Curated annotation (Swiss-Prot):
SUPFAM superfamilies: vWA-like. This is Inter-alpha-trypsin inhibitor heavy chain H3. It comes from Mus musculus. The gene is Itih3. SMART domains: VIT, VWA. Heavy chains are linked to bikunin via chondroitin 4-sulfate esterified to the alpha-carboxyl of the C-terminal aspartate after propeptide cleavage. Keywords: Cleavage on pair of basic residues, Glycoprotein, Protease inhibitor, Proteoglycan, Secreted, Serine protease inhibitor, Signal. Residues 1-21 form the signal peptide. Residues 22-33, 650-889 form a propeptide. Its main location: secreted. Residues 29-158 form the VIT domain. The keyword Secreted applies. I-alpha-I plasma protease inhibitors are assembled from one or two heavy chains (HC) and one light chain, bikunin. Pre-alpha-inhibitor (P-alpha-I) is composed of ITIH3/HC3 and bikunin. The modification Aspartate 1-(chondroitin 4-sulfate)-ester is found at residue 649.
Amino acid sequence: MRTMWWPCLVLALLSGLETSGFPRSPLQLLGKRSLPEGVVDGIEVYSTKISCKVTSRFAHNVVTTRAVNRADTAKEVSFDVELPKTAFITNFTLTIDGVTYPGNVKEKEVAQKQYEKAVSQGKTAGLVKASGRKLEKFTVSVNVAAGSKVTFELTYEELLKRNKGKYEMYLKVQPKQLVRHFEIDAHIFEPQGISMLDAEASFITNDLLGSALTKSFSGKKGHVSFKPSLDQQRSCPTCTDSLLNGDFTIVYDVNRESPGNVQIVNGYFVHFFAPQGLPVVPKNIVFVIDVSGSMSGRKIQQTREALLKILDDVKEDDYLNFILFSTDVTTWKDHLVQATPANLKEAKTFVKNIHDQSMTNINDGLLKGIEMLNKAREDHTVPERSTSIIIMLTDGDANTGESRPEKIQENVRNAIGGKFPLYNLGFGNNLNYNFLETLALENHGLARRIYEDSDANLQLQGFYEEVANPLLTNVEVEYPENAILDLTRNSYPHFYDGSEIVVAGRLVDRNMDNFKADVKGHGALNDLTFTEEVDMEEMDAALKEQGYIFGDYIERLWAYLTIEQLLEKRKNAKGDEKENITAEALDLSLKYHFVTPLTSMVVTKPEDNEDQTSIADKPGEEAIAETTTMSFLTTQQSSQSPYYYVDGDPHFIIQIPGKNDSICFNIDEKPGTVLRLIQDPVTGITVTGQIIGDKRSNASSRTGKTYFGKLGITNAWMDFRVEVTTEKIILGTGAELSTFSWLDTITVTQTGLSVTINRKKNMVVSFGDGISFVIILHQVWKKHPVHQDFLGFYVVDSHRMSAQTHGLLGQFFQPFDFKVFGIRPGSDPTKPDATMVVKNHRLTVTRGSQKDYRKDASVGTKVICWFVHNNGEGLIDGVHTDYIVPSLF
């Protein structure tokens, strides 16, 4: 699948603390050699953690910073975080010496009095303000007594929007001092499956710091971790200042087996729509460019550079023109022309000669462009199946001709008549951005600020690339009549390649059996309808595992999207309509605890024995041996080194220091099913196993004993694989295959790999020093009426496998804990029941036994274990069917 890289919705963070007497810029705490390491003016920031959890594009982010005042006097400590302008703060808590002071979201007018009182008394109040292009800065401070500890925790949520084929989270990291425990931990869960995941940091300039960054994805789950030690943070081996200063970016995309994807949880649904492979709809585009005097110098030069680059990307099926406005209006051509090579060459000559002139006549420039597009359509000089777009770039306010904003809005609205979108690009800060935004929103477009930086030309090019490839026009998303409530926006003038349409709503009947969604649109060749049908029972089963992120995510996603769209509509509303929209958005903001332009978060904390109020305020609008099913066993015994295996009917055993007990469970699946046992994206190692039954079993039966009859081991980085059956072993390196039988005794080696076959007993597969597997052959009498040969799989060394290792066996490679209590008689007097707490689940378990065949393949060693019922539910991550794969390789 094609993955396009593009700046997207930004998640930014700046976390830190500063003391009184230091500049109030974020985290400007410089290390001093005369002080203990990590302590600045008596304040030690000993922990900063950014925890990001994303489920179906909806991000839940928690920023936690902990500090201690090691001075002998009280100190003021400040907490600064930069977060995306598109995010809503949902919680802020302040904990001092174990006492937590929570935040409460209130209507802005109610909170304002508390805010003004705090400021008038000279107290520091928390606030949120704009910071850079895509960020807002949250700041709050508090006095901390000598020897006291303080914890700041900020939570915010946002919907990641897809641009140019990817979702992006961008974190601004600037502690500017060494932090004993600094960690970024991001977990991503996408039911469609993750197709790519990457992470990078601008400040990682050496291998030592780079080794602190790990990233992996498998199936539906992705993980990024950045956890540098103190030494890895240092700018030099003996320095006390930090390298952590710059941008940390995570990007990912999802699999798209169909154009749409619908997810339903607890009566709320979200519908993602992003078709691929459609032909591009030809576009008719007019660029309306401000060439007034204020555009002189660098601005006009960057505009020329951007337009020349855009002309390189215009497709030959497109039609275009340029309109320049200052006091007067001039055009390149009298009408739209096709983007032939000759016309593009002429257009570049025109662009190179653009220069600044005098005043700013926005009204006439826009009306001329609109007239040109309307006439081209009326005269049929552009393709019937094409779409029109107008893009205006200006750096100031109208000051000649019609200069009243309301009148310009009326003129443009009447001229366009809803037929095509207007996109406004505001260059710099000396302009009425609210006017440009309103003008665009009224005409199905959007506004974007172009910042006066060295990359302004790239910003202009970037915006054009967003709208360069329309795949559908007049998109309508439809659902069964009377089946839904509270639907978010479901009509869009365009769908652009690399983007995504998101619609959410509420079901009238939560017990409905199926759900259908239709998306209709005009394509380049014909009208298209995309239908997505959902079986509710299958949906419930597929989404069970999502609770490990946060269970009500679809409802919160719906609320977020609804509020966001209401606030956008509010900008153009008037009178009663505006009041009604405001009331609805306010109610939702309060209900779901979102800090929006209509609400504020109030935190009351102690300050010199008085209450102090802080405000988080968002800127405004700008039996187990006899079982007949597959059994899995985990064992923990403190006296031995960790080992892991699956054997018998098959038993999974995991041994971890610190416990002297075992856990086991069964998987009830039919013969022929292939299960993923181990998958490590870092080492590239994957192990799978195919189930066989006894001789009475058939492919559709889940009764009778089951075993592993075939195993597959691959190492993607070495281009190596081995297929093991009860009859033969096939080794493959690249395109070369070698076949051996269990009658052989042989060792095969190459760099980083060793395979040893011990005749009729076992084989050992080792990947260097630190990863070693043993496969045991179990043979029975060939004429036995029921039993047949099977395999056992043992991990005898796994210490070089990464923390991202997963699978039915691999997920237990990392330490975990469980507690057993409440032992009581069970239904079988010889097998008591008990309550087990493991992985935040409370389970009923039963005492039983399994076998360890490492020392004696015929008899085995008895292992006592606690049996987890229902296919290991609550013990394994997700459900057992998540580990079923189509084939061995």
